[in-house]
Amino acid sequence: MLDTWAGRIVHIGDTGDGHRMKLLNNFISLGYAAIYSEALALAEKVGISPPRFDSVIRNGRMDCGFYQTFMRWTLEGDRDAHKFTIANAFKDLTYLESMAGAAGIANPLGNATKNAFAGAFAAGPADQYVPMLATHIGKVNGVDLTPTKDGKKQTT
């Protein structure tokens, strides 16, 4: 049954280790999402459009499956390309913060990532997906990163 949802299954240890590893994995991917979002907003602000930005990153060393699905919202308006909600991202990053606190380590990048998602979560709507963070980060910085699809602006 697990094969239905998992690309691969790796046994990593004791009870609870899988959940902790999931939080670490999501921290890495959501950190990328926050970086992509801020980079896209800054790029647009200095005159580099999302398609021009993508033309440099795609097929280079920073290209990966996560980047490709993330960018499908901004470039194509594909709302369903990366179906993990901002609410779930914020929740996982809050759990990561608790895990770091319990372990007694500083978590400045995790907290910065969590705060990026906290703002998007608070602004709503509740059903927006992780790639829509770019639209939110753009908006709070006076940049319109709302994608168009079939000539129409998409909504988050």
Describe each model-derived feature in a short phrase:
Residues 17-141:
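Helical "substrate-binding/catalytic lid" subdomain
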Residues 3, 147-156:
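ATP-dependent carboxylate/acyl-activation modules
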Residues 1-15, 66-72:
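Acidic-glycine-rich active-site phosphate/pyrophosphate-binding loop
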